[in-house]
Every structure is written in structure tokens, then in C-alpha cells.
């Protein structure tokens, strides 16, 4: 769990868990990013899957191409399709990680994170289907002549299973990024809400007026001057004889 938490720890202080836009590029730091490491594993697993199936998944039987997965051509085609598109998507998202740190627009980062989360979740499901499909067909198929291609078919099945884990981790990291960005948007929206600013100003103005009223003298200066004149006019004057 500690290793998983370390992998999913992606908050770098910028929008949607990325770094500050315009920062200096460090190749070593970029290569050690959890997103890049997991994408590289997805890329490697995809290469193994479609490489094994395309190289030794087909054989000729009675003048026709025969899929070693119980003769089911769709099984070989589906495994190739999932592997090829996973390979291309992994390279695309690794390039996206390079550009992600340079995206100054929060909306652009949000679109990228949502695309990453959606595609990673979809390809987790696609590899899950591929694992079940290929394993089911292989368990029902007869051993190939001289055992040629059997190792590659088993390897493709195992790496479909590994791909489920790697793509699921990509989806989890993208989901955590999305939560970080959603929390930042909520905080900034609350702080800049005009209604909140108006209420704060109104409360501050009321408090200032109350303090002024309590600190002010009950009688103004002109009234004090009038009282002094009345007192001076009412002073006793000694009569003259």
C-alpha cells in the first residue's frame, strides 16, 4: 500500500497535479514521473502482446491461415488490435505528459486529464476482455504441431493480464488528478464569488459604523459652544450705586 500511495502521489503544486507552467525541463525528473513510468510499461506490454500474436499466432492449414487460438481468427485479430492501439496510445500519452507541464491553460489540462482517464479506463476493460477471450480459446485449442507458437500464445495472455494492472493504474492516477483539479476550481470559485465579497464588505461597513457611533460624543462641538455662551450670559453682575 505504501508503494501504491507513493505512485499515486502526484500533486506537484500546479493545476491538476502538474508542475508550474513554464518551469525548466529536467529529463531525469520527467523519466521518473509515475505517469511516464507506468505509460512505458503499458507501451512495453502492448508491444509484447501484438508482437507475439502477429509473429506466431497464425499458421497455414489446408492452404488457409489458421489462428492458434482454437482456430478463431477473431481472437488473433482482437488481440492484435488491442495491442496496436495500446502501443500507439501509450506513446501519445507519454508525449502528452511532456506537454502537460507546459500547458498554461487550466481548461487544456482538464481536457487532457479527462481524455487520459476515459481512455485508460476503456483500455483496462479492453485488455480484461482480451485476457478472458484469449485464455478461453487457448484452453480449448489443440496443441500446435511440434509446439511451435505455444510459448508466444501463452506470453500474450500473461501480458494481457499485466496490461490490465498497468492501464488501471493510469486510470487511477488520472482520476486523482481530476479530483485535485476539481478541488482547486471549487476553492478558487468560492474565493472569487462576488456574493461572498459583498457580504464581507457589508459586515465590515456595519462594524465600522457601530464603532463610530459608540465612540462619538453624544453632543456635538457646536452644542458645547452654545452652552458656554449661555453660561457666560447668565453670570451675576454687581450693581453700581
From Swiss-Prot:
One Pfam family named in its UniProt record: MARVEL
Biased composition (Low complexity): 220-241
GO cellular component, one term: synaptic vesicle membrane
Stretches for region Disordered: 216-241
Highest taxon of source: Eukaryota
Boundaries of every MARVEL domain copy: 30-179
Annotated knockout phenotype: No obvious phenotype. Viable and fertile with normal basic motor functions. However in type 1b boutons at the larval neuromuscular junction of some mutants (30-40%), there is an increase in the number of synaptic vesicles with a large diameter and a decrease in vesicle density under resting conditions. Resolution of synaptic vesicles from endocytic cisternae following an intense stimulation is delayed, and consequently boutons display an increased number of cisternae.
Entry-linked InterPro entries: Marvel (IPR008253), Synaptogyrin (IPR016579)
Transmembrane region(s): 34-54, 81-101, 115-135, 155-175
Gene Ontology biological process terms, A to Z: endocytosis; synaptic vesicle exocytosis; synaptic vesicle transport
Keyword terms, alphabetized: Cytoplasmic vesicle, Endocytosis, Membrane, Synapse, Transmembrane, Transmembrane helix
Subcellular location: Cytoplasmic vesicle membrane; Cytoplasmic vesicle, Secretory vesicle membrane; Cytoplasmic vesicle, Secretory vesicle, Synaptic vesicle membrane
Membrane topology: Multi-pass membrane protein
Family per record: Belongs to the synaptogyrin family.
Function: Required for the correct formation of synaptic vesicles at nerve terminals and has a role in the regulation of the synaptic vesicle exo-endocytic cycle.
Protein name per UniProt: Synaptogyrin
Gene assigned in the entry: Syngr
